[in-house]
């Protein structure tokens, strides 16, 4: 896997989408399977109830030792026709029974002499009217409901089919995305290899640039050496002054009042700096009152600051904390910050921030 944040992010998003699509597909298949099982169970119960209600119509038949699958479809059609006939007969009998039970008194049946009897004719006309109007209307409504049910069932079936196709298409798209992601990783690796090879070729084909870089490095080393020599001389002077002060304190000779006052002033000055201007990220703070300079270390970089009448007049940077190709820009940035004329503490903070932008040592 290429260590590219874009590719890694795409892979995470693709895996999450694939897991979500898989969960939805499994849920849809489970719902469809449950629906089919319920339909089969309902049909089974209906057939069993139909057989039980019409058991007298069926005669026992000796089952053959082997079942011929080719006759199943014909038997299903016969059973469907028989079911429709039974429904029709049952409805006719129930309708006639209810009609005779609630419309004609049992005492009047025996008094009907013939079909030409006025009462029979009246009832016949009423039945015909009921059949022509109400029953036809009800049959039409029933047919419409059946048609609506068929349409709704077909719509549900179409939606399930579309859902299955969508799940399958989503899986195919996920596979294509994985393939494209692999191709992107391969292209990224190839590009990185080409860039590295090109960088090597450029380095090999440009000895002048290498020589210039070596010269810049040597120049920086010389500046660093000069800085260290100046620092060493300052330390030697400080050591000599301290030895003189200690010799004056511990000896029996007359005390040098000027040296003692200078030491006390120097010590008070250092303490004042530490309490007022020191940033917590500054290390190895040293103050040189005679030369109006102070220096400290931050992230492997020695920072030498020269003070003038209006604040910081110059900032020098030395050390290995800043790469050679960035040292010139870093020196320019810190001196621009120093020239803004802000308070000393704020200027030091801004200089430290600029050093952070260029250093490689944390």
Curated annotation (Swiss-Prot):
Its main location: nucleus. GO terms for biological process: homologous chromosome orientation in meiotic metaphase I; regulation of meiosis I spindle assembly checkpoint. It holds the Pfam family Kre28. Disulfide bonds: none annotated. One of its GO terms (cellular component) is Knl1/Spc105 complex. Residues 6-62, 131-246 form a coiled coil. The keyword Coiled coil applies. Keywords: Centromere, Chromosome, Coiled coil, Kinetochore, Nucleus. It is found in: Nucleus; Chromosome, Centromere, Kinetochore. Belongs to the KRE28 family. Acts as a component of the outer kinetochore KNL1 complex that facilitates microtubule-kinetochore interactions and the spindle assembly checkpoint. Kinetochores, consisting of a centromere-associated inner segment and a microtubule-contacting outer segment, play a crucial role in chromosome segregation by mediating the physical connection between centromeric DNA and spindle microtubules. Component of the KNL1/SPC105 complex composed of SPC105 and KRE28. Part of the ten-subunit outer kinetochore KMN network that includes the KNL1, MIS12 and NDC80 complexes. This is Outer kinetochore KNL1 complex subunit KRE28. It comes from Lachancea thermotolerans (strain ATCC 56472 / CBS 6340 / NRRL Y-8284). The gene is KRE28.
